[in-house]
Amino acid sequence: MKNICLLGATGSIGEQTLDVIKAHDDKFRLTAMTFGKNAEKAAEIIETFKPKYVGVGDEHTYETLKQHSFSYTFKTGIGEEALIEAAVIPEADIVVNALVGSVGLLPTLKAMEHKKTIALANKETLVTAGHIVKEHAQKYDVPLLPVDSEHSAIFQALQGENPKHIKRLIVTASGGSFRDRTRRELEGVTVEEALNHPNWSMGAKITIDSATMMNKGLEVIEAHWLFDLPYDQIDVLLHKESIIHSMVEFHDRSVIAQLGTPDMRVPIQYALSHPERLPFNEAKSLDLWEVGQLNFAQADFERFRCLQFAYESGKIGGTMPTVLNAANEEAVAAFLSGRISFLGIEDIIEKALERHQVIAKPSLQEIREVDKDARKFVQTLLT
């Protein structure tokens, strides 16, 4: 039995992780969980899975949760401290980081210090502090298992392979909600249109990131850290069906791809069960006859400027990816609240990157300060 700590239980990845735990309740137990503001959903999860510890986003949500009557007692915590308390709970074997944003960094590092296996769905952890996370993983000798479908695909393709034989990684991308539109057609698109992803069921922020292709850019930076490869050995390929989740090309020109129907529960389960493979009858089997054909196209930097920003930031390194991520988070929030246009997201990110003075090898404190400063700068652009 593996005991799971789930950070971000009420989000999209969190819910799908709970599906996996429920499907294999003889293999997995939810020991600790955190959530942000959705007290109603959290109350259902608590009563169903009965975790020993529950972290709540803020005081107001905590007061709302207290109004529910539960059939058992459990420990609680509030705010960022609760994220860390949950991540280091002695009973947990695996910490699933399903948080959105850079708030996921510190709990990951603390969990590593307590020898927890990390199942990472929080992109920002590696994007903002990849060098620190990798150092921690090596220092404390803890596995860092990818949950993203693309990185899981690469991870699976590399099982039993010598990393020295890799020629390149090919990260596939659906292209998001607006993959068939020109830049001119993107002017004036609505939030509702942007949130209508053709293939995947995801949260609002990641769905917008998918539409701008920033999501793929962040995944490229993640892949750089996860698989220790330079950026010129990581390619992005548009593949609208989302059937091939990613590929690895080796020096002998062989290519290994991982395929499957788009269902995030499959890579989540692989991260939880690794090195085992468990059955998962909830997922639909891949029927290539039914799919009929697979389509591919080049990822154009001029069309997808956020992808270009990510490659450039990754190559520069240091604190540049931190600024990229912080500016993107603030810009996406502004778009979702109707304060800027869809293309305005790119403009804000570009301005934040242009003004930044890079720190080559930042400490954790410097990363936090740069993150805060970048967000403040974006807010000045929005007022």
Curated annotation (Swiss-Prot):
Reactions that this protein is recorded to catalyse: 2-C-methyl-D-erythritol 4-phosphate + NADP(+) = 1-deoxy-D-xylulose 5-phosphate + NADPH + H(+)
Entry superkingdom: Bacteria
EC number: 1.1.1.267
Disulfide bonds: none
UniProt pathway annotation: Isoprenoid biosynthesis; isopentenyl diphosphate biosynthesis via DXP pathway; isopentenyl diphosphate from 1-deoxy-D-xylulose 5-phosphate: step 1/6
Cofactor entry: Mg(2+); Mn(2+)
GO molecular function: 1-deoxy-D-xylulose-5-phosphate reductoisomerase activity; manganese ion binding; NADPH binding
The family this protein is said to belong to: Belongs to the DXR family.
Record's keyword annotation contains GTP-binding: no
Binding site for NADPH: T10, G11, S12, I13, G36, K37, N38, N122, E124, G203
Protein name per the record: 1-deoxy-D-xylulose 5-phosphate reductoisomerase
Name of the gene: dxr
EC top class named in words: oxidoreductase
Record's function text: Catalyzes the NADPH-dependent rearrangement and reduction of 1-deoxy-D-xylulose-5-phosphate (DXP) to 2-C-methyl-D-erythritol 4-phosphate (MEP).
Entry keyword set: Isoprene biosynthesis, Manganese, Metal-binding, NADP, Oxidoreductase
Entry keyword annotation includes NAD: no
